[in-house]
Regions:
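A short alpha-helix-loop-beta-strand transition element characteristic
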Residues: 183-190
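Peripheral terminal appendages
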Residues: 192, 197-228
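ATP-dependent adenylate-handling active sites, centered on carboxylate activation for C-N bond formation
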Residues: 1-180, 196-209
Length: 228
């Protein structure tokens, strides 16, 4: 919103039940960006599944689910634009809290979980972003991953990060209150997982595909053969 020229923004969702697209459009209109919506179809999701698992090198369910949308939106950016460097919001959850850390019993537990998630960045969210972006010949810039910023946030008393305000990630939201960067309803909107926000039907199609590919007996047998 403060830049001399409008930035280009992108959002992705299922063609039938995308949740986040309308909110992304609202933000784009508010900040005056050149906005592009990318719709993914059930066929595109299923056709990309093997590629996504291969490029991730993991069978972690949550990472794969979240990577489907990121892979396809990066693919669209590469094929449809000349943009090669992206700004992305990774690491804010690790620093300021996930939805489940709203229920941390105390500040020590919150801090320990945050430290653990940062140590394991390369295994989950950053793995997803790194592979999905780079495989499409793009580069990422991660403002929340700035080392000085990470050290600063991790030095803040974890008591202040606990959800005592009725909203998760309160400190991050509060930091954006001044400056008129975001619409008020977006700033205080409930957090949603990326893999849900693209549309619940995506997971339904993946489940249907898996259940139609393997019987319960075959699955149990393969679990014994491939322990990891």
């Amino acid at each position: 919103k403060k830049s001399k020229e409008p930035i280009k923004t992108f959002a992705i969702g299922m063609s039938e039940d995308a949740i986040d697209l309308k909110y992304a459009k609202q933000v784009a209109e508010y900040i005056g960006s050149e906005h592009k919506e990318v719709f993914m179809t059930p066929d595109e999701v299923l056709e990309s599944l093997e590629t996504v698992i291969q490029l991730l090198g993991t069978y972690d369910i949550t990472t794969i689910r979240a990577s489907m949308g990121m892979y396809l939106v990066c693919k669209a950016i590469h094929e449809q634009t000349d943009i090669r460097v992206l700004l992305t919001g990774e690491i804010s959850d690790e620093l300021f809290g996930y939805k489940y850390t709203d229920f941390a019993p105390d500040a020590t537990a919150f801090q320990e979980e945050s430290q653990k998630r940062i140590r394991e960045l390369h295994m989950y969210d950053v793995l997803r972003a790194d592979r999905c972006i780079s495989v499409n010949s793009l580069e990422a810039r991660v403002p929340f991953g700035d080392i000085d910023f990470v050290k600063y946030v991790m030095s803040i008393d974890s008591e202040l990060k606990l959800n005592k305000y009725g909203k998760g990630k309160y400190l991050l939201r509060h930091a954006f209150e001044e400056g008129d960067y975001l619409p008020e309803e977006i700033l205080w909107r409930e957090k949603a997982a990326f893999s849900d926000a693209v549309g619940h039907s995506m997971v339904d199609y993946l489940k249907e595909y898996a259940e139609g590919t393997y019987s319960d007996e075959e699955f149990e047998s393969l679990c014994m053969k491939y322990a990891y």
